[in-house]
């Protein structure tokens, strides 16, 4: 009898290259996996940061072995949105990799295209260079 692989793939996780480091955001409900990734966790920003390609490769391999689909994003151009700094953007902030102020707006690099779309529905605009 042939065996069928019924391993369920978890969601894809985008790993962004920004400013010579690699970042991703994901909530893991597997405490064992989180403990393995904990050395890379930036608690203040609720994200994971790898400072070099070797660490990134190690994390991507671990995520893949745990059933996730890690995707390296070297061009983050489609992911930034901007929203007025006085608008309610807390939910967007929780689902962004990076954020910074820009005049009367806040620029957010969203963690995936689902959240880019959500941000646009909440009144954000795509950030153009």
Regions found by a protein language model. Give the residues of each.
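Accessory DNA-engaging acidic/polar modules
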Residues: 1-129
